[in-house]
């Protein structure tokens, strides 16, 4: 999949925009298959789809991609234009007025959310001079210091049956971040995981940090911080 090329440095920082190599999307797909999920019965949603890397995944009832970045969506549409069944693309702010209806998903549909949602701590001093606090509106119940946490909260509102996404490992292992996930951790538990390095996405960065490919399943028990403290995370061989 083509790397993101149309955003300047400030836009990239504000949107947390890094696009996902095929090797990572294959790991996500394999994680879903290993969980023995009958994917043909599920709608697949990537609510921050960029160029559509995760929409290449096959075998789902329908593939839907949404993004606030119109240029990225236009590129994605060109990439998929010759597909017999192309994904449904939606140009929208996925953190505003969040509902299944917004994404053309029935309340009765089984739903899997995948992707590499933006992550960007807007209160961090790192490159703070380039960050815009109010770059895009966010529903009040989703507002957080890091936009990636906002996305995870939005997945709970959408009541996805399974979620397989990339996000900083610190969302789970740092207790303050974990608690800031709010209702997400009440309704989901970690089913599988693989840790990778942020170097994959930003090799010229001033510093690297661990990212987890995390598979979550919705249930009535959720998870607490003790569960995470005792969880054995896997790494790439």
Task: Identify the role of each PLM range.
Residues 35-39, 104-109:
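Glycine-rich phosphate-binding loop signature in dinucleotide/nucleotide-binding domains
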Residues 1-77, 98:
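Class I S-adenosyl-L-methionine
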Residues 120-144:
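Mobile active-site "lid"/loop adjacent to the S-adenosyl-L-methionine
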Residues 78-107:
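S-adenosyl-L-methionine
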Residues 208-237:
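Flexible, glycine-/basic-rich loop-and-beta segments that form/coincide
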Residues 112-127, 154-155, 164:
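Internal, well-ordered alpha/beta segment that forms a basic, Gly-enriched binding/recognition surface
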């Amino acid at each position: 999949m083509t790397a993101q090329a149309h955003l300047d440095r400030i836009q990239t920082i504000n949107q947390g925009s890094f696009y996902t190599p095929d090797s990572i999307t294959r790991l996500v797909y394999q994680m879903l298959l290993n969980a023995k999920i009958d994917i043909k019965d599920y709608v697949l949603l990537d609510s921050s789809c960029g160029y559509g890397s995760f929409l290449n995944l096959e075998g789902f009832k329908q593939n839907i991609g949404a993004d606030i970045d119109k240029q990225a969506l236009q590129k994605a549409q060109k990439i998929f234009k010759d597909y017999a069944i192309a994904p449904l693309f939606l140009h929208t702010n996925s953190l505003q007025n969040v509902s299944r209806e917004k994404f053309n998903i029935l309340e009765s549909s089984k739903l899997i959310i995948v992707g590499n949602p933006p992550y960007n701590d807007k209160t961090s001093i790192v490159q703070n001079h380039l960050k815009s606090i109010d770059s895009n509106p966010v529903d009040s119940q989703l507002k957080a210091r890091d936009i990636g946490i906002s996305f995870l909260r939005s997945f709970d509102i959408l009541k996805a049956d399974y979620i397989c996404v990339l996000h900083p490992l610190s969302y789970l292992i740092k207790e303050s971040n974990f608690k800031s996930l709010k209702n997400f951790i009440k309704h989901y538990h970690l089913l599988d995981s693989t840790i990778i390095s942020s170097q994959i996405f930003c090799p010229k960065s001033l510093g690297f940090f661990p990212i987890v490919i995390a598979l979550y399943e919705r249930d009535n028990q959720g998870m607490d911080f003790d569960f995470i403290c005792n969880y054995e995370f896997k790494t790439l061989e």
